[in-house]
């Protein structure tokens, strides 16, 4: 994780007790064990080992994430949309549970499928359920791994599809980019309703009612 400074003021963890419980569980692994349980290189494992054994500086969450989805975000344009960011955008984390854009976190590595003495989905079930239970609806723009942390009666998924001369195709990398681009537009336009989401054009992907289902919104574009 590399830090990028956007001048965000930080806020405290939403689930400090849960993270404090997980920390010693991860701290028990040595470099070689981390290689095995996380399926990473030895070089990566030594870095992860340091995450849990050495004092680390805390940064605003959105300043640390660098995956494909996050690379689509025009974060330097968000300073007039911080209230929307805080109240409408949540980052799912196996280590921290849920994060606001400016929650202060230290670098870490953990996914929901890692074999620990506890089952992470069970561990996070109640706090995550209670956190989201009063929301009217939720739009998931994350992977199935992290979406599975959420239990809510109105959880919507976005299906990005390319129409290749009548053949409907889904490309994993294109989907990741489109998720980030959709989130970026939602933030910049402060989207609040499902109807507003359906008006978005995501790099050529537009809402398709025929391919959509009750809790799955399909966005389709012609394959170039």
Task: Say what each PLM segment does.
Residues 75-224:
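Internal, well-folded beta-alpha domain core
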């Amino acid at each position: 994780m590399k830090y990028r400074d956007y001048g965000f003021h930080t806020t405290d963890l939403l689930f400090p007790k849960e993270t404090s419980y997980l920390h010693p569980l991860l701290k028990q692994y040595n470099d070689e064990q981390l290689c095995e349980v996380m399926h990473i290189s030895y070089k990566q494992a030594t870095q992860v080992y340091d995450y849990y054994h050495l004092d680390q500086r805390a940064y605003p969450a959105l300043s640390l994430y660098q995956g494909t989805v996050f690379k689509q975000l025009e974060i330097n344009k968000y300073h007039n949309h911080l209230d929307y960011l805080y109240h409408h955008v949540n980052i799912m984390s196996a280590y921290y549970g849920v994060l606001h854009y400016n929650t202060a976190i230290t670098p870490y590595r953990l996914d929901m499928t890692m074999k620990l003495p506890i089952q992470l989905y069970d561990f996070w079930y109640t706090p995550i359920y209670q956190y989201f239970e009063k929301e009217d609806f939720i739009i998931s723009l994350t992977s199935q791994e992290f979406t599975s942390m959420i239990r809510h009666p109105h959880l919507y998924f976005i299906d990005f599809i390319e129409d290749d001369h009548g053949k409907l195709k889904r490309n994993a990398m294109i989907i990741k980019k489109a998720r980030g681009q959709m989130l970026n537009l939602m933030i910049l336009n402060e989207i609040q309703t499902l109807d507003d989401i359906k008006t978005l054009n995501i790099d050529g992907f537009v809402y398709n009612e025929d391919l959509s289902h009750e809790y799955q919104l399909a966005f389709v574009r012609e394959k170039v």
